[in-house]
UniProtKB/Swiss-Prot annotation:
The keyword Translocase is assigned to this record: no
Intracellular or extracellular location(s): Cytoplasm
Composition-biased stretches (Basic and acidic residues): 75-92, 106-131
Lineage: Eukaryota, Metazoa, Chordata, Craniata, Vertebrata
Gene Ontology cellular-component annotations: cytoplasm; extracellular space; sarcomere
Ranges annotated as biased composition (Polar residues): 8-25, 34-45
One Pfam family this sequence matches: Taxilin
Region (Disordered): 1-55, 71-131, 464-486
Protein name per Swiss-Prot or TrEMBL: Beta-taxilin
GO-annotated molecular function: syntaxin binding
Keyword field contains Lipoprotein: no
InterPro entries tied to this protein: Taxilin_fam
Length: 676
């Protein structure tokens, strides 16, 4: 009953828009030569209200479908449950077949043979059978059959075999029953779950039905209001048509009287009127053809409505025959209803468009006489303007092409400038890092120099006390080399050794860095090499007296450059000390010429990149060596053996910064790579 009520409501919903369309087709207006009155404007407002109401109803229906789901989902669920039930039924059937086979085998085994019956008739076994029958009356048929089969056998071994077989069969039956019990328990749980799901779906369906009933009632009310409005509009339009026809007939009679009076003068006007009448006839014919077309469309819609009604009757019969197809038909009908609503909306829109066209034709008919005179002039001016615009368009196209080419060139130049800027920033960072390293080394060497000054002053104090001894030593110095000169020579040798060690350490670090970027694949290591090559300044020529020692002095002076404010002035004794320095022998290690010069691997900075500040100029005045740090009274100073190991230790600490094998250098290299 509920399903029948629902289908009837759907029929009402589907028939209502067709009836509205029929009423509207009957009430279509005739082309009028006057503009719309204020009554037409007021009638447009309820049309908007009806459209809003229909949209709200459609939204409510979509919300119901979304919340309670469509019929397709329910059909899919039923299909899945049916598919799961099929293999379960097959399993149950197989289990029942196996049980039947076991029962048949037992019945065949339990059938007595004729030979056994003859043996049972013996008088010796009759008494025992009576006793066993009394015992087995309470056990049942199975126990009696088992005892009969045991009595038929003679030996106890056969009886034991039979008992073992029977026990094995019973075990198999017991296991099969347990499996079946587990399966039935699972099946029961599934059925309970399905029952809960079906109950929830049933409740949801009831709620959906109640909401759909309320929607149907609202639609019926809406359809009634629409019918009343269409009837009122039809009446108003009929009255307007009558007024327009009366007015038109009066104007025609007046025109005929004027034509009779002034027929000779107004022949030209008659011709124009005939032409206009022909145009009016053509417009009226077109409108009639459109009305006929609309009537055909409405008839087609009525036929479709009849077909839909027939389909609904068939669906009701099918509902009585098979309830399973109810959900599919429900979905089908809902889809059809939505389609019909959309079609009704489209027809309403077409009707409004046609009415607007009719009003436009009426206005154009009034203004047609005025526009004919002005059209030729406007057409000529329009042609001239079009020619001017074509010329302007050609010029603008040329300008756009030139500007596009300029824009592309500017983009390419800008990309090149960005790449150059990135390279220059990397180089600048490398320069800054190297400058910081050199400043740290200069500070360390200044501290060493200050310590040496202190030691020299401490050594000068006992020399002033023993002035006589110093004068004698000066006299002897003219003839033979004194102990102070020997001490100075030893200090020079120690300084040379320190320089060699620093040079070797620096060379080892360069080798380690050159082996890593051999393929040139890592850009970070290549940048580190470029920065290290740039940081090696050139030494003045007067400090490199010997070719082998010159390389060492250049490498050490790179790390000992300091501001010229803290450096002592070079004296005349410097030249004598440099001349007295021993030349390198075969035992001294010669540093390989692997240190890159600043001009070999360093790119020349362009004008756009900021140059680093000139903190350390490589001039003879501002780049002092260890030989310049020695003061004038060094020649008279005795040999101090205690100060050299400390200096060597400090130099070794400085050399550790350059040796890659030690962990401190590894940390420094990693920091440099991170900065690059």
């Amino acid at each position: 009953m509920e399903n029948d009520q629902f289908t009837e409501k759907q029929q009402q919903v589907t028939t209502s828009p067709t009836q509205d369309n029929q009423g509207q087709s009957k009430a279509e207006p005739v082309p009028v030569s006057q503009p719309l009155s204020p009554t037409n404007q007021t009638s447009a407002q309820p049309e908007m209200a009806t459209c809003d109401i229909s949209e709200e109803l459609n939204r409510q229906l979509e919300d119901i479908i979304k919340t309670y789901g469509s019929a397709a989902s329910l059909v899919e669920k039923e299909g899945t449950t049916a598919e799961t039930d099929k293999p379960e039924k097959e399993d149950v059937g197989s289990m029942e077949d196996a049980e039947c086979e076991d029962v048949n085998e037992e019945s065949e085994k339990d059938k007595p043979a004729p030979g056994d019956a003859s043996r049972a008739k013996e008088p010796s076994a009759s008494k025992e059978q009576k006793l066993e029958k009394k015992i087995l009356k309470g056990l049942g048929k199975e126990a009696t059959l088992l005892m009969q089969s045991l009595n038929k056998l003679t030996t106890p071994e056969e009886k034991l075999d039979l008992l073992f077989k029977k026990y094995a069969e019973l075990l198999e039956e017991h296991r099969a029953e347990q499996k079946q019990l587990k399966y039935l328990q699972k099946r029961q749980a599934q059925i309970t779950k399905e029952k809960d799901q079906l109950q929830s779906e049933h409740s949801r369906a009831i709620l959906a039905r109640s909401k759909l009933e309320s929607l149907c009632r609202e639609l019926q009310r809406h359809n009634k209001t629409l019918k009343e409005e269409t009837i009122q509009r039809a009446r108003e339009e009929d009255e307007k048509r009558k007024e327009i026809t009366n007015h038109f007939q009066g104007t025609l009679s007046e025109i005929q009287a004027q034509i009779e009076q002034q027929s000779e003068r107004n022949m030209k006007l008659c011709q124009e009127n005939t032409e206009l009448a022909e145009k009016l006839k053509s417009i009226i014919d077109q409108y009639e053809l459109r009305e006929e077309h609309l009537d055909k469309i409405f008839k087609h819609r009525e036929l479709q409505q009849k077909l839909v009604d027939a389909k609904l009757e068939q669906s009701q019969e099918m509902m009585k025959e098979a309830e399973e197809r109810h959900q599919k038909e429900k979905e089908y009908l809902l889809n059809q209803a939505a389609e019909w609503k959309l079609q009704a909306k489209m027809l309403k829109e077409q009707e409004t468009v046609l009415q607007a066209q009719i009003t436009l034709y009426s206005e154009r008919f009034e203004e047609f006489q005025k526009t004919l005179t002005k059209s030729n002039e406007v057409f000529a001016t329009f042609k001239q303007e079009m020619e001017k615009m074509t010329k302007k368009m050609k010029k603008l196209e040329k300008d756009t092409a030139t500007w596009k080419s300029r824009f592309e060139n500017c983009n390419r130049a800008l990309l090149d400038m960005i790449e150059e800027k990135a390279m220059r920033t990397k180089e600048y960072e490398c320069f800054v890092l190297k400058i910081q390293r050199l400043e740290n080394l200069c500070r360390a060497l200044q501290e060493e120099r200050n310590e040496l000054y202190r030691k020299i002053k401490q050594a000068q104090l006992p020399e002033e006390v023993n002035g006589n001894d110093i004068l004698e030593e000066d006299d002897d110095a003219n003839t033979n080399p004194s102990s102070s000169e020997q001490a100075s020579i030893e200090l020079c040798a120690a300084d040379k050794n320190m320089l060699q060690e620093l040079a070797e350490a620096f060379r080892v670090s360069h080798k380690a860095e050159e082996t890593l970027p051999s393929d040139g694949s890592n850009p970070e290591t290549c940048n580190v090499q470029m920065c290290e090559a740039i940081s090696v300044p050139e030494l003045p020529s007067h400090l490199t007296s010997q070719p082998e020692a010159g390389n060492h002095c250049e490498q050490f002076s790179m790390s000992t450059s300091a501001p010229p404010e803290h450096m002592p002035a070079a004296t005349e004794n410097m030249t004598t000390l440099i001349e007295n320095m021993p030349k390198p022998t075969k035992s001294m290690p010669m540093p390989p010429e692997m240190v890159p010069t600043p001009t070999e691997s360093v790119p020349i900075p362009t004008e756009g990149v900021p140059t680093p500040p000139k903190i350390m100029p490589a001039t003879p005045e501002s780049v002092p060596t260890l030989m310049q740090n020695t003061s004038a009274p060094l020649g008279n100073m005795p040999a101090s053996t205690k100060s050299t190991p400390k200096a060597v230790e400090h130099v070794d600490d400085i050399a550790e910064l350059f040796i890659p094998d030690q962990p401190a250098e590894q940390k420094g290299d990693t920091d440099m790579e991170a900065v690059d």
